């Protein structure tokens, strides 16, 4: 248009109509040498929720459409924080920005500042159909769509800022080739709290909230208690049965009932108790105690060899169990029907087993099976002292008056002692002292090793092979009818080791006190005092007795066979045999009571 204008101005003298026609022709058909470009952003302000998609639109106009321009999107941070200013509108900075905007209507304090004081990054570049992302946005789902639209498929923290759209063309150098759009990314806040995904709770009344909290607390403590009982059944204090596992009780109910029955005397409903107290009206007399004895030599196996009472002195047949299942049935006590392999029940099993055998001294129900039952805690059928690992220290033997005056090897007899030096009268005053009750039995056999010497050949007695069998009970300790019990056949060195009971506490002594046969014998020697025997028994130690027992047992096991039964004697009358049988039977019953 510049040449046309100069041509119209350079013809002042021509016809005016011709001049106007030429000017219009030049204006219409003569183009300019360069055209301008225009870039615009329809929506310069965007607010989007985090992780939501957004598109920043950008359009441009240019005169040359033969070549495609280069579209560049740049990111520049805000000069001031819009979110902070929105929450504090009365701040000094906000008031200053308001004054600047009022004085300059086109001024924007959040966008207009130098690039050196803010962050500048290239987001994406497009030339033709090729889109290239900047280094900071590699891997993000960002692209340029249409002519120059920037699209975010998912926004992120830090995307808030100012995005500039620039269009560069080599042929269109004039015009406005840049425009910007503001983007603010906010976090999502819901109007009502979400308890569950997709579920929104509306306004809740105060009283309803309190009820819900109380019910939740009660349910929590209930579940906690049930779980505690299931994990620790031996320490729980709640006697309830869990519905999740009814076969396994969460408390030792059977053990609790059994212990209560054992202490209060009420019979248990789980198992018959042998330790509960009986009512006074139904209390039976105490049954005779069983004394397991050692079998005599050469007799059947109805005797228990491993059981002993009082140093193997009394021997009586054992009352054996008729049914083996009875013993196990009684010993089982209070049984909890549970798996013994379960770790949580092992302690319970041990406790109820100990409770079942808690106090064997209490009498049980008056039946033969329970009376014959033995406790697993303490029993007369335990191993004897020879098999125990620990032994009591032996006490020093105490000598008597006779021991101090005479040597143990002295052959002096009791008839040679003056009467004033002998003890005062009492039962068995004419008998020498022995080391044990078994030694008293050996005194009756002059040929035995316990007597210390053999009987004289003039006495006409039988030797060891023809001696009667040794008695292991206290029934045959002394027989006044036997001539072997005369004082001249005893050795005085056994006087120091006599072991017996107090004649006043022994029921057999009371029985003998009424026996006219013993009265005649005691009258012959009234100088013996039975209290001296009791005093000697209290002073004797266990070591000497055990040594004598062990030596005697080793000697018998090594080279001696059981003696033969005594031969039949024509001199023994029928009355004498019957009298001895009655006496042995009565004393055997007394030994059972003892």
Curated annotation (Swiss-Prot):
Modified residues (Phosphoserine): 308, 314, 332, 375, 379, 407, 410, 436, 471, 473, 576, 588, 591
Annotated knockout phenotype: Death between 12.5 dpc and 15.5 dpc probably due to impaired liver and embryonic development.
Stretches the record annotates as Disordered: 375-594
Residues in the Extracellular compartment per record: 36-206
Cross-link (Glycyl lysine isopeptide (Lys-Gly) (interchain with G-Cter in ubiquitin)): 583
Residues bearing the modification Phosphotyrosine: 478
Ig-like V-type domain: residues covered: 89-181
Residue pairs linked by disulfide bridges in the UniProt entry: 113-165
Membrane topology: Single-pass type I membrane protein
GO CC list: bicellular tight junction; chylomicron; low-density lipoprotein particle; plasma membrane; tight junction; tricellular tight junction; very-low-density lipoprotein particle
GO MF annotation, one: low-density lipoprotein particle binding
Tissue: Expressed in epithelial tissues (at protein level). Specifically expressed in liver and to a lower extent in kidney (at protein level). Also detected in brain, testis, ovaries, adrenal gland, intestine, muscle, and lung. In colon, only expressed in the lower portion of crypts. Expressed in the liver.
Record-linked Pfam families: LSR
Cytoplasmic side: 228-594
Cited PANTHER family: LIPOLYSIS-STIMULATED LIPOPROTEIN RECEPTOR (PTHR15923:SF1), TRANSMEMBRANE AND IMMUNOGLOBULIN DOMAIN-CONTAINING PROTEIN (PTHR15923)
Its job: Probable role in the clearance of triglyceride-rich lipoprotein from blood. Binds chylomicrons, LDL and VLDL in presence of free fatty acids and allows their subsequent uptake in the cells. Maintains epithelial barrier function by recruiting MARVELD2/tricellulin to tricellular tight junctions.
Family membership noted in the UniProt record: Belongs to the immunoglobulin superfamily. LISCH7 family.
The name this protein goes by in its record: Lipolysis-stimulated lipoprotein receptor
Species per Swiss-Prot/TrEMBL record: Mus musculus
């Amino acid at each position: 248009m510049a040449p046309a204008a100069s041509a119209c101005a350079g013809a002042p003298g021509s016809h005016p109509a011709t001049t106007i026609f030429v000017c219009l022709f030049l204006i219409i058909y003569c183009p300019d040498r360069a055209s301008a470009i225009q870039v615009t952003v329809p929506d310069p302000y965007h607010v989007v929720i985090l992780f939501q998609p957004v598109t920043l639109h950008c359009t441009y106009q240019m005169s040359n459409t033969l070549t495609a321009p280069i579209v560049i999107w740049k990111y520049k941070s805000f000069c001031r924080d819009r979110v902070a200013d929105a929450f504090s509108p009365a701040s000094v900075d906000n008031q200053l920005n308001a004054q600047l905007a009022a004085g300059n209507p086109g001024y924007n304090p959040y966008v207009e500042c130098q690039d050196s004081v803010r962050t500048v990054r290239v987001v994406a570049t497009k030339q033709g159909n090729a889109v290239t992302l900047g280094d900071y946005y590699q891997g993000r789902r960002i692209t340029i769509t249409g002519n120059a639209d920037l699209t975010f498929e998912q926004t992120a923290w830090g995307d808030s800022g100012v995005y500039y759209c620039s269009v560069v063309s080599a042929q269109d150098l004039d015009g406005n080739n840049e425009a910007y759009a503001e983007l603010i990314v906010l976090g999502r806040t819901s109007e009502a709290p979400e308890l569950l995904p997709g579920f929104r709770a509306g306004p809740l009344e105060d009283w309803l909230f309190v009820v819900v909290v109380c019910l939740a607390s009660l349910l929590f403590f209930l579940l906690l208690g049930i779980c505690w009982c299931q994990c620790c059944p031996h320490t729980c204090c709640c006697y309830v049965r869990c519905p999740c596992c009814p076969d396994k009780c969460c408390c030792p109910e059977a053990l609790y009932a059994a212990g209560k029955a054992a202490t209060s005397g009420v019979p248990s409903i789980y198992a018959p108790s042998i330790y509960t107290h009986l009512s006074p009206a139904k209390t039976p007399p105490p049954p005779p105690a069983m004394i397991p004895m050692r079998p005599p030599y050469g007799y059947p196996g109805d005797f228990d060899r491993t059981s002993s009472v009082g140093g193997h002195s009394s021997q009586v047949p054992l009352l054996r169990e008729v049914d083996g299942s009875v013993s196990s049935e009684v010993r089982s006590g209070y049984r909890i029907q549970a798996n013994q392999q379960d770790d949580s029940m092992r302690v319970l099993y041990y406790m109820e087993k100990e409770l079942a055998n808690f106090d064997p001294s209490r009498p049980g129900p008056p039946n033969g099976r329970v009376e014959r039952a033995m406790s697993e805690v303490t029993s007369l059928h335990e191993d004897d002292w020879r098999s125990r690992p620990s032994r009591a220290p032996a006490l020093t033997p105490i000598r008597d008056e006779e021991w101090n005056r005479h040597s143990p090897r002295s052959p002096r007899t009791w008839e040679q002692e003056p009467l004033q030096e002998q003890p005062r009268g009492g039962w068995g005053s004419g008998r020498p002292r022995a080391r044990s009750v078994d030694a008293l039995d050996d005194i009756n056999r002059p040929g035995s090793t316990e007597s210390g010497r053999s009987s004289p050949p003039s006495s006409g007695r039988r030797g060891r092979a023809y001696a009667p069998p040794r008695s292991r009970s206290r029934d045959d300790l002394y027989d006044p009818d036997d001539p072997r019990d005369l004082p001249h056949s005893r050795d005085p060195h056994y006087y120091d080791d006599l072991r017996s009971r107090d004649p006043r506490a022994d029921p057999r002594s009371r029985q003998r006190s009424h026996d006219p046969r013993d009265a005649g014998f005691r009258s012959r020697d009234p100088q013996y005092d039975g209290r001296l025997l009791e005093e000697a028994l209290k002073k004797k130690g266990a070591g000497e007795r055990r040594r004598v027992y062990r030596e005697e047992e080793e000697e018998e096991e090594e080279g001696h066979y059981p003696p033969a039964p005594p031969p039949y004697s024509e001199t023994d009358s029928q009355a004498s045999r019957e009298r001895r049988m009655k006496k042995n039977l009565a004393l055997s019953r007394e030994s059972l009571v003892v």
